[in-house]
Amino acid sequence: MSRKGPRAEVCADCSAPDPGWASISRGVLVCDECCSVHRSLGRHISIVKHLRHSAWPPTLLQMVHTLASNGANSIWEHSLLDPAQVQSGRRKANPQDKVHPIKSEFIRAKYQMLAFVHKLPCRDDDGVTAKDLSKQLHSSVRTGNLETCLRLLSLGAQANFFHPEKGTTPLHVAAKAGQTLQAELLVVYGADPGSPDVNGRTPIDYARQAGHHELAERLVECQYELTDRLAFYLCGRKPDHKNGHYIIPQMADRSRQKCMSQSLDLSELAKAAKKKLQALSNRLFEELAMDVYDEVDRRENDAVWLATQNHSTLVTERSAVPFLPVNPEYSATRNQGRQKLARFNAREFATLIIDILSEAKRRQQGKSLSSPTDNLELSARSQSELDDQHDYDSVASDEDTDQEPLPSAGATRNNRARSMDSSDLSDGAVTLQEYLELKKALATSEAKVQQLMKVNSSLSDELRRLQREIHKLQAENLQLRQPPGPVPPPSLPSERAEHTLMGPGGSTHRRDRQAFSMYEPGSALKPFGGTPGDELATRLQPFHSTELEDDAIYSVHVPAGLYRIRKGVSASSVPFTPSSPLLSCSQEGSRHASKLSRHGSGADSDYENTQSGDPLLGLEGKRFLELSKEDELHPELESLDGDLDPGLPSTEDVILKTEQVTKNIQELLRAAQEFKHDSFVPCSEKIHLAVTEMASLFPKRPALEPVRSSLRLLNASAYRLQSECRKTVPPEPGAPVDFQLLTQQVIQCAYDIAKAAKQLVTITTREKKQ
């Protein structure tokens, strides 16, 4: 626990003397100024604790000091040791530099962008590389070399990697070898102490069987780290995990007679909000609990920060962290909810924590929901029996009545104005917080629906105006085509259609090229005989593709009609096969399809051109032609043959896979924006893997035609995306590559994948509701 080492400790980021904070996940010590930047990055980048004023498990503090003294900082500053980097102007921050922008930019580049970490020479296949690194980590944790394991983790090794041959995770190996510090490092990077091996034994079992009882007890504490931290935040006590794993504080106020009405909200709305918390799925409840855990960490660090800083110089708006930073791995909705936790006052936040602890205990023990009125009556009876000696009680439970609070945190907890009672109810106080959050989300959704309705109305007006213009131009075009002479007798509609498609002498011309919408390049196949106005109506779509992906994926309950006007039959659901004459891949048809794919958003005023030989195909049909010509469809599409299966996966699973697809597409789009064409191939492999996993959720032969159509489009687009991305590598060295055209094709394929995924989410949600 001592901070004194064999050599003087300095800040890892600016070399300031006597650092007071530690970054647990990076294994370095930092000064106050640099710590303010670390806190603004978020726990997903750097987990910080004060060395003297925060509560530390002894082995965790020993792990941090071991890494710091053994040069863990060189992992994050590897390239700065290269003289070439010094000559290029890249340098480390100094203590005299300003926090903003010099220190902050350096720290963000160092830990968030990993700009100075040693890069592996070959990154073509990230999946194979990560697997090899994880196997090295699996072998290294049996030794005491922490720096090697941290270096492997920084390069992408997985702390929860399950070795396929040995049937264990790295934490199993560290527990068996008694490597406590290695186990601490693995847990910091997400290793699960309760994960079973191939025989169902956990790392805790390994440690006990090897005689490492202290390590086994520490792993149990790590397994209950979340609930222990929440309980310790409220009352300064933790369960000993021998008599029980949970302490459930209860709000109380002994100094007032009307304590129950002031400490608990007994309204019907509060009871409904409590029931909604209990009705959450395990995954959503875990996410909520982790978000509250991060908020507890932020508030505790805030309290230490305000107690230790010189308020006249350091405590400024820039150094403060008023809410949880954005985590790009989470959805926008979850990030907004995480930031709103900072608006809870102390009493509201304590009530939310009690509810989470009660619900966690109930779920872990498998108890059924109890009546809230029974709990309230029991709480009221216990409240009337309390003495009136203190305003605030320490909190204990029936399963841990003999444990004393930690001495290092006792003084801090006594200064908190919290009202606690000794109780071990499996159901805590009813709170309004969940109801308020849902109410705010509902108001936001309603406002968005109103806005979309207005946009829909304006687009409908614009559509009608365009239809009138098209009819007018069509009439003028017909007049210009008529040769001078006697007026011909009126013809039937079918004859007029033939006259439009046929020129003098029976020769066919290209049909009128319509202005393809930039919002919906993937237009569906249209039936014959439709007017150009109808075709434009089916092709118009009011939103950009990126908006469509975000709103459609994460707001699946909003009616699809509010997002777009386009309706029609997709290319994959046309009742004729690719081998039919309608979809025959002639040379000119292929060239025309390629041209339409490249100029999908361009408009042309040449109304005298007609299409030769090809029916009215949308862009989606053209892409279907290209796939048939180039690759004769991917074999994955053939797997959809077989008996009809009416089953559908759960909406939750489909949304999870869709989020993974969207995340990989966003990574590909970032690479395109940054002109990182060498990243196209690995990104397309990730997208193809995510698409394959998503398609595997559905039956081989779905009964619903829309599902089959969407799956065909999803698989075909993913396969075409791979083919386009492989074109970044020229077949011959030095051969020119049109990266601008290639990028357009890649973005188009990515859009088609996102659209197909959105359709599957919408269909699954609709079918599950019926």
Swiss-Prot record:
ANK repeat copies, ranges: 132-161, 166-195, 199-228
Region spans: Interaction with gamma-tubulin and localization to the centrosome: 1-124
Zinc finger (C4-type) in chain: 11-34
Residues modified to Phosphotyrosine: 224, 392, 554, 563
Stretches for region Interaction with PCLO: 245-374
Location relative to the cell: Cytoplasm; Presynapse; Postsynapse; Postsynaptic density
Region Interaction with NCK2 and GRIN3A, annotated ranges: 375-596
Domain Arf-GAP: 1-124
Compositional bias annotation for Polar residues: 366-383, 578-588
Knockout or disruption consequences: Knockout mice are born at the expected Mendelian ratio, but have decreased survival compared to wild-type littermates, with about 50% of mutant mice dying postnatally. Surviving animals develop normally and are fertile. They are however 60-70% smaller than wild-type littermates. A major abnormality in knockout mice is impaired lung development, characterized by markedly reduced numbers of pulmonary blood vessels and increased alveolar spaces.
Region (Required for localization at synapses): 375-596
Description of post-translational modifications: Phosphorylated on tyrosine residues by PTK2/FAK1 and SRC in growing fibroblasts. Phosphorylation at Tyr-392 is induced by activation of Ephrin-B1/EFNB1 and catalyzed by SRC family kinases. It is required for the interaction with NCK2 and for GIT1 recruitment to synapses in hippocampal neurons.
Keywords: ANK repeat, Cell junction, Cell projection, Coiled coil, Cytoplasm, Cytoskeleton, GTPase activation, Metal-binding, Phosphoprotein, Repeat, Synapse, Zinc, Zinc-finger
Positions of the UniProt region annotated as Interaction with IKBKG: 429-629
Ranges where the record places region Interaction with ARHGEF7: 254-376
Positions in coiled-coil regions: 449-483
Protein name: ARF GTPase-activating protein GIT1
Protein source organism: Mus musculus (Mouse)
